Design a protein with these regions (language model features):
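RNase H-like nuclease fold core
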Residues: 1-49, 53, 57-63, 140, ...
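RNase H catalytic domain
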Residues: 11-17, 55-153
Length: 176
């Protein structure tokens, strides 16, 4: 089974419960040309929605009949733990409810689940990666060493793609 690696990131500039401008990025380091990177920017959204949108578009980039192992690196614990801790399965079994009530971003979670179901030959592995490691590192030698790590580079690429300011036009709806 072939392995496809993707780095995903989402971000939004929000204050409290308000929505703000945001974007997401999906980066495939082993692909080339227009298939290597994808991003969109939005008005009136939140970070969680952008993180999920990045995952959604990474999944939809895989052909329905492909027998591949899709490995997603994400700095979003919310997204990664929803898979690794089995939260998504629990939400589905509970009618899209959790201990706080209705699952947030249910429309995106349903769309992700649908796309996964459409790809029965694909397996999905979710891996959490710490964000902004290079920017946080003060020591120059350690910073240089971090820049040699392909996972750090992939995360940085997805982070740059997720910046809504790189888009000349922001979409008004973040619905998939």
């Amino acid at each position: 089974m072939n392995k496809v690696i993707a780095y995903t990131d989402g971000s939004a500039v929000v204050k409290g419960k308000a929505k703000g401008h945001g974007g997401f990025g999906t980066y495939f380091p082993d692909l080339y040309g227009s298939k290597q990177a994808f991003s969109l920017g939005f008005k009136d959204t939140k970070t969680g929605r952008m993180e999920l949108s990045a995952l959604y578009y990474a999944i939809t980039a895989i052909r329905i009949d492909s027998a591949v192992e899709l490995v997603i690196y994400s700095d979003s614990e919310y997204v990664v733990k929803s898979f690794t801790l089995g939260r998504l399965k629990k939400w589905i079994a509970a009618g899209w409810r959790n201990t706080s009530g209705e699952v947030k971003n249910k429309d995106l979670w349903k769309a992700i689940k649908h796309e996964l179901d459409m790809r029965p030959l694909m397996t999905l592995e979710m891996i959490h990666i710490r964000s902004h490691q290079v920017e946080k590192e003060k020591d120059a030698a350690k910073k240089q060493a971090l820049m040699q790590d392909p996972n750090i580079i992939g995360n940085m690429m997805a982070d740059r793609l997720a910046d809504y300011k790189r888009h000349t036009e922001l979409l008004t709806s973040d619905k998939v």
